[in-house]
Design a protein with these regions (language model features):
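Bacterial N-terminal signal peptides that target proteins for export
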Residues: 1-7
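Beta-strand-rich extracellular modules
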Residues: 101-103
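Copper-binding active sites and cupredoxin-like electron-transfer domains
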Residues: 48, 61-69, 133, 138-144
Length: 144
């Protein structure tokens, strides 16, 4: 009987966590409300572990994908197809860089903070990051 109670309690706790998870929408745009071209809106998003983010190609010819080195180690990222909606559930706390591959050089990048992040990991900008993308990412990270 205790085993059944413990199993039921564990299942209830797991389901309760899923019930409180939120879904956030990010638009992929040719022009943002601030006049900037080739943007994600919002450009910075803070979510809780277990939350899902849906990337919506409001304007065509965009995708959303994570970047190796711009997300927590051991996490398998995602790659959305051009002009198609993609959803991803962020289970692991940390910072995530998300880009639009065709417009990365134009600075189409966003940052997602999952849980509480105290500082930008030293490996977050490893590799080649286009100048405009780096500028926008730096501005987004000022939200930490």
């Amino acid at each position: 009987m205790f085993r059944t109670f413990a199993s039921t309690l564990a299942l209830g706790i797991a389901l309760a966590g899923a019930a409180f998870a939120e879904t956030h929408e990010v638009k992929m745009l040719n022009k943002g409300t601030d006049g900037e071209r080739m943007v994600f809106e919002p450009a910075f998003l803070q979510v809780a572990p277990g939350d899902t983010v849906v990337f919506v190609p409001t304007d065509k010819s965009h995708n959303a994908e994570t970047v190796d080195g711009m997300m927590p180690g051991g996490v398998e990222g995602f790659v959305g197809k051009i002009s198609q909606e993609v959803a991803f559930t962020f289970d692991t706390a940390g910072l995530y860089g998300v880009i639009c591959k065709p417009h990365y050089a134009m600075g189409m990048v966003m940052t997602i903070e999952v849980g509480e992040v105290d500082a930008v990991p030293s490996t977050f900008f490893e590799g080649r990051v286009p100048k405009k993308a780096k500028e926008r990412c730096d501005a987004q990270l000022s939200n930490l």
